Amino acid sequence: MRERVFVGGAPFLGICVGMQLLATTGVEHGDTPGLGWIPGEVRLIERTDRAIKVPHMGWNDVQIRPHAALVEAGEAYFLHSYHFVPDDGHHALAMTDHGGGLVAAVGRDNLIGVQFHPEKSQTYGLALLARFLDWKP
């Protein structure tokens, strides 16, 4: 897979845990190495407010950053207890608010990862998947 993505330039889309695997490391089952394709760490969502539920489950707004590729603003379905914190903030393509800002999408070169579930996000998610299939990074 690494050769197809980095040598061959094949577009890569990671969804939910697939996005988290792009990180350097995660903490879900102790310190766990990721692929390291986008430097960063996956951390447990901290409950700073008792009203905030973990896991983050349900519909939430996706706010894009000015440099976002493929991802558009809209509403998507999320289900996760951990979140990706990229080392370089430029790799964060979109954010969502769940008791504070959480990265909703990451990317660089021919890699895109989304924390939400496009397959459950109705029209918004189908549009993202269609853009990915047509993407020529």
Give the residues covered by each predicted segment:
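Cysteine-nucleophile active-site neighborhood
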Residues: M1-H56
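Amide-donor transfer/coupling interface in amidating biosynthetic enzymes
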Residues: V5-V7, G40-P137
